[in-house]
Design a protein with these regions (language model features):
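Class I SAM-dependent transferase core
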Residues: 2-70, 75, 105-108, 112-120
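S-adenosylmethionine
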Residues: 94-98, 102-163
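Conserved SAM-binding loop of SAM-dependent methyltransferases across substrates and taxa
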Residues: 81-94
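Residue-level preference for alpha-helix termini and adjacent loops
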Residues: 41-44, 50, 55, 82-85, ...
Length: 163
């Protein structure tokens, strides 16, 4: 992981200096991501700087643009390695996060990681298009996030039924 000072500077650059207080948990996330990525393909970007800038900072940018209410429920569609939902949960511990992914092995990674990081989160093993049609999940979330899931038209069809 990049140094604490570099992380503080990065968080200041994206206008979210409060996230810098979670440096230790972001560092643990980075280490675990790199270790798990050797066993299963979670991401192509695994170098310390790339993880900090392209994964963590990019995932946190929406928090600087949208005011989510305290305690908002967030579904992270196609969670994969946890981006953007887990960095958002680290920066905003009041968010109620559900990770939705079609592959159980990714959810296993996220379940173990969220436990290590002390982040309460729900895991939903499903395809987004199916979850959106399920009464248990349809219109149950305040906000949906996704990253590298589908083109915008398809992504809207996956996410809109959930919020």
């Amino acid at each position: 992981m990049i140094s604490n000072a570099a992380f503080v500077q990065l968080m200041q650059q994206i206008n979210l200096p409060s996230a810098a207080a979670e440096y230790d948990r972001f560092a643990l996330y980075c280490t675990q991501l790199q270790e798990w990525n050797q066993r299963m393909n979670l991401t192509a970007i695994t170098d310390d700087e790339g993880v900090a800038e392209k994964h963590f900072a990019d995932s946190l940018l929406p928090l600087t643009m949208v005011q989510l209410p305290i305690g908002a429920s967030l579904v992270d569609v196609g969670s994969g390695a946890g981006f953007p939902g887990l960095p958002m949960a680290l920066a905003r511990p009041d968010l109620r996060v559900t990770f939705l992914d079609s592959l159980q092995k990714r959810l296993t990674f996220l379940a173990q990681l969220t436990q290590m990081l002390g982040v309460p989160a729900a895991m939903l093993h499903a395809r987004a298009e199916d979850a959106g049609q399920d009464k248990a999940y349809r219109e149950q979330f305040d906000v949906a996030t996704a990253r590298a899931v589908a083109n915008l038209n398809a992504l809207a069809e996956y996410c809109l039924p959930l919020v």
